[in-house]
Amino acid sequence: MTNEQISKLETAILNMEEKKSRIYFLVQDTKGNAKASVRYIYQIAKTLKDNGYNSIILHEKPDYFGVSSWLGEEYMELEHQPIEGTNLEISPDDLIVVPELYGFVMDQITKLPCGKIVLSQCYDHIFETLQPGQTWSNLGFLKCITTSEKQKEYLEGAMRNVSFDIITPYISDSFEKSQLPPKTIVNIHTKEHRDTINIIKHFYAKFPQYRWITFRDLRGLPETQFADAMKESFVSLWIDQQSSYGTFPLESMKMGIPVIGLVPDLVPSWMNENNGIWINNKTMFTDVLSDFIQNWLEDNLNPNLFESMDDTVKTLPTKEIFENEVVELFTKMFNVRKENFVIQLDKFQTIEE
């Protein structure tokens, strides 16, 4: 038995040294709709693949729609495997990364002999599919990757005995300032579609003099179409109270477009009183938008707003920084696991002698 254990440990150590260990990433099937949380996972997986690691995308069913229509064909070149109807190969040196929404999957794989990591992008989902009293550490998930310091602070209070690391999302170079004057278009991006409908109807009812203003709902568009559509506008509206990072307003700022947004429950560290028009009551949206339009038409917007937006964008990680953070974190994880395996191997070899 000891010889068998020694052989398994030696194989696991060699796999990690040669980057053969599998890194599984579970993703949601968005049925062709663009979703920032899924894009983030694919970006991490592709970065690892491009740096020699063996990253694999896991999806629930064999008829997975894929992401080529909105994210790009290069992301579908990653290896994909369905959970349903297949026996996954899992070795002790492998890692599996599961979004916080999949508590039921964590429960199912709790006994798998591999490293288990939670990827948490929305604090509002962490208890949604867990049983009462369950925690990540109960299920063998002792590490978590999240997107911001604010979310990390919240999670540390909710999930004990778990270590947390941050990989900050980056804003794609698709989002750049337009060289053309903006059109009379308002970008609107809300988590709940009913908020979009309510704001538009309320605005037109209360301010019929602005019927010539066009609202553009950007939800679900592929990234390039999203960016092309966004750059034509003169202001963006944003509602996502459960947001832990705020990708949309940052994309808007990078394009030089002011944001009127509802302050989320976890206020992101980049948000300040100067880089946007932030409100705490969504019933105020129409009035605030009307005032903004009037100031815009009169060329009376505060120039400090645009300076603060640019200053905020300068603090954001680039794609290169994001990729370095990803590679450094997973290299560190494998190094720690390899050290633990070497310690176990030394013990078994001592017993064998």
List PLM regions with ranges.
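Conserved catalytic-core segment of nucleotide-activated headgroup transferases in glycan assembly
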Residues: S37-Y40, I44, E153-F226
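Aromatic "clamp/platform" in nucleotide-sugar-dependent glycosyltransferases that forms part
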Residues: Q241
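A charged, aromatic-enriched C-terminal amphipathic alpha-helix characteristic of glycosyltransferases
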Residues: L297-E352
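Short alpha-helical segment that forms part of, or immediately flanks, the ligand-binding pocket
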Residues: A227, L250-K254, P268-S269
